[in-house]
Amino acid sequence: MLQAPNPASRADQTLSHNMKLLAHHELAGFGGLGEGMSMQMTSDGRRILWLAHESAPKNFSGVDVTDPSNPKLIVQTELPHMKLRSNSLDVVGDIMVVAYQASTVGI
């Protein structure tokens, strides 16, 4: 039976028999992610992985994964206040849609 991966896993460790961890990114310490995840192929050929954050203060992050073994954080945005979270997101072409959830009605 396979054990749950250790958060400090190294790229050279085998976590599964049919998959290999290529890299890990700490997202500047804001790794609490929601369901929102989308891959974008840019006009210049880069692959950007967009990630929604589960809780404030971060809204979403963009990670350049063109070289999957060397991911680069290229943008990380802030929510307008602590009572929101970015539940999910999607990207089509150059347009991103983010769904927010509020902890208080009417914000």
Cite the ranges covered by each PLM segment.
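Feature marking well-ordered beta-strand scaffolds used for ligand recognition
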Residues: M1-I107
